[in-house]
């Protein structure tokens, strides 16, 4: 069958690469795709924006698309799934109503509270003065979040009260994130270890994907500004089998059942960004209604099952009949970013060494365009170099060796991706 993937990032390159390996996939279209998806066998880019829902539906109808997988959040939040379903097309992702779990942080926090799902203490504000009063009452460190979609950058972890007050003023009166920041969520700072817990949902049944851990801060040792993610590895040893079970029982099932009970049946990838507290209690930091980027890249490297089969089963409400198989090895992905990211960054630099990957390694392209036959930088996060290894340390060393070979002017990356897992491995050795 023909398959359509919506999006243009490193995540979509990884999804297209994995989907193309399925014997069921005749042709894989990516809208709009990037220079990386264009290089894959069986894969073709389509010049349609990820949010041009009408054109996407028309394309799917004209090209006999048997399955569509949505990569990014923006098309989900505007109802791409509703439109495809109305046209009788199979699409894997949540409806517009269900996608509020990512589209509105205030909706999510209120939902978690209603269903007694563990999360940080919080309050929502639309006015500056009450928000500032709450900050002064609670003190720092404290977290300030823009309510709407802000490309992963609308979260300020304020270590001082001054920083928190500045963030509130900037979002509510300074209009830093436009409509997305017209309401803010202020919540307690959770001090634990983060994990990305991604599952597939068919409305009621849940199939967990491999666990992972993302690194949001731009600098080594988790310093500097928040980004969309500078690297990730899988599995995340912080999620022990016992904690895995707690997450399923205390977070995932209550979320899926709670959404269904409120009339928002959830199908699609559900990503719970969790803080695992020192006592092993998982708390929800955020939900995303799609696969994470860069977590998708190392996770797809470990997935041995047919992703198309899993998605089709989920679309048909038969996910309980499938079991995902995973490679025993660890995988790790390092994002190579353009100079200046996450602020204003350089563009248009020629990239070399993309073809350096050997077996058990893969370079996934994100902010890259093909200009007159040359690959040049065209985004903040440019590529994600990923590798498998017997341990997280091995995978890290393989990925670092690959990162050395992919070059352009001003590229930078974190050399410590996976450091928590590596420290655990050393302690357990």
From Swiss-Prot:
Mg(2+) binds at residues 286, 288. It is an enzyme of class 6 (ligase). One of its GO terms (molecular function) is phosphoribosylamine-glycine ligase activity. Its cofactor is Mg(2+); Mn(2+). Residues 109-316 form the ATP-grasp domain. It catalyses: 5-phospho-beta-D-ribosylamine + glycine + ATP = N(1)-(5-phospho-beta-D-ribosyl)glycinamide + ADP + phosphate + H(+). It comes from the Bacteria. Pathway: Purine metabolism; IMP biosynthesis via de novo pathway; N(1)-(5-phospho-D-ribosyl)glycinamide from 5-phospho-alpha-D-ribose 1-diphosphate: step 2/2. Its EC number is 6.3.4.13. Residues 209-231 are annotated as: Disordered. ATP binds at residues 135-196. Keywords: ATP-binding, Ligase, Magnesium, Manganese, Metal-binding, Nucleotide-binding, Purine biosynthesis. SMART domains: GARS_A, GARS_C. InterPro entries: ATP-grasp, ATP_grasp_subdomain_1, PreATP-grasp_dom_sf, PRibGlycinamid_synth_ATP-grasp, PRibGlycinamide_synth, PRibGlycinamide_synth_C-dom, PRibGlycinamide_synth_C_sf, PRibGlycinamide_synth_CS. The keyword Metal-binding applies. One of its GO terms (biological process) is purine nucleobase biosynthetic process. Binds 1 Mg(2+) or Mn(2+) ion per subunit. Pfam families: GARS_A, GARS_C, GARS_N. The keyword Ribosomal protein does not apply. HAMAP family: GARS. Belongs to the GARS family. This is Phosphoribosylamine--glycine ligase. The lineage of its organism: Bacteria, Pseudomonadati, Pseudomonadota, Gammaproteobacteria, Pasteurellales. The gene is purD.
